[in-house]
């Protein structure tokens, strides 16, 4: 089984581009903290397609906390100088924003990580972390994301890529 779950922060603003087949793609990097005494960060290259690419470029920016679920992919390509380069990156099947404006980072992570863990494990963590903040799960294809900034701040969006892959 090839499955990766990462929580980190965007290293730079995501930028989408359209490839010749018409598909939208975003290459982005997240910084994932290492929970060791020296606390080094790992910089993980990621790729999102179509709906995720649109979500990342529309709603997220440098420094925003995100969770991704995906798989590790290794590939190679030949650059303009004829040199073969090898790349390992995470193809993001799901992307969730963990950032909420006007909240402290500790509230931010506590509420959203609980929700994310429940979605992966089926275990309700409300008993361990009592929080009165609402959680809304919304498909990226709905138009509710554009209503206003207050609602946008309260939305946790999961976007599934499985249907977009060829």
UniProtKB/Swiss-Prot annotation:
Residues 126-135 have a biased composition (Polar residues). The keyword DNA-binding applies. Keywords: DNA-binding. GO terms for cellular component: nucleoid. Residues 126-151 are annotated as: Disordered. Residues 1-99 form the SSB domain. GO terms for biological process: DNA replication. The keyword DNA-binding applies. CDD domains: SSB_OBF (cd04496). Gene3D superfamilies: Nucleic acid-binding proteins. HAMAP family: SSB (MF_00984). Homotetramer. This is Single-stranded DNA-binding protein. It comes from Ureaplasma parvum serovar 3 (strain ATCC 700970). The lineage of its organism: Bacteria, Bacillati, Mycoplasmatota, Mycoplasmoidales, Mycoplasmoidaceae.
């Amino acid at each position: 089984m090839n499955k990766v779950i990462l929580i980190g922060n965007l290293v730079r603003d995501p930028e989408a581009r359209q490839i010749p087949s018409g598909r939208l793609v975003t290459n982005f990097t997240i910084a994932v903290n290492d929970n060791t005494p020296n606390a080094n960060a790992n910089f993980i290259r990621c790729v999102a397609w179509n709906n995720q690419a649109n979500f990342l470029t529309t709603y997220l920016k440098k420094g925003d906390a995100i969770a991704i679920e995906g798989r590790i992919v290794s590939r190679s390509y030949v650059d303009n100088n004829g040199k073969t380069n090898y790349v390992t990156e995470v193809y993001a099947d799901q992307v969730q924003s963990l950032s909420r404006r006007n909240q402290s980072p500790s509230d931010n992570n506590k509420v959203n990580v609980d929700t994310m863990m429940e979605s992966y494990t089926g275990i309700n963590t409300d008993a361990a972390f009592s929080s009165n903040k609402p959680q809304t799960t919304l498909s990226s294809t709905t138009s509710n994301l554009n209503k206003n900034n207050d609602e946008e701040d309260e939305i946790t969006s999961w976007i599934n890529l499985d249907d977009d892959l060829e």
